[in-house]
């Protein structure tokens, strides 16, 4: 059996591999996919981001983020929407087509994870989910500390 740090490392490497494969599937570079993924996560959480927030997250200038957003919009992956609270500003959204492509591509992995999760007892599931959430908190903390 693998020790815990190695198992977590293997999980991170596997997740990175999924992102690389998904980026290729969408015809994107890994860095462009990273931007798209951030927009999707922000959108899912109900806190959509604009180009300025995306630039801050990626550690790039606003001008570079605008070029990136333009590229993703031209490719049909992102759209700009006026913000309800300030129509002079925009937030970014992943297009429905791209969202469907991502969901279709990830469906086999999601189904397998669901199958594995269902094979656990309720207590095991709770323990694993709690542990994974704590790992996520630690990883987010590390990435927040490293942010410019």
Stretch-by-stretch model annotation:
Residues 70-126:
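Charged, amphipathic alpha-helical coiled-coil/dimerization segments
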Residues 4, 11-14, 109, 116, ...:
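Amphipathic alpha-helices that form helix-helix packing interfaces
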């Amino acid at each position: 059996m693998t020790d815990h740090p190695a198992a977590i490392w293997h999980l991170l490497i596997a997740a990175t591999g999924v992102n690389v494969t998904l980026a290729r599937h969408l015809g994107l570079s890994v860095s462009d996919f990273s931007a798209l993924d951030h927009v999707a996560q922000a959108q899912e959480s109900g806190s959509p981001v604009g180009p300025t927030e995306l630039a801050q997250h990626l550690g790039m200038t606003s001008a570079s983020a605008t070029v990136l957003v333009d590229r993703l919009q031209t490719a049909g992956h992102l759209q700009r929407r006026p913000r309800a609270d300030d129509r002079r500003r925009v937030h970014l959204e992943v297009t429905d087509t791209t969202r469907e492509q991502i969901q279709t591509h990830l469906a086999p992995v999601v189904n397998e994870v669901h199958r594995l999760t269902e094979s656990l007892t309720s207590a095991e599931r709770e323990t694993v989910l709690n542990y994974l959430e704590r790992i996520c908190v630690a990883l987010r903390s590390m990435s927040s500390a490293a942010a410019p």
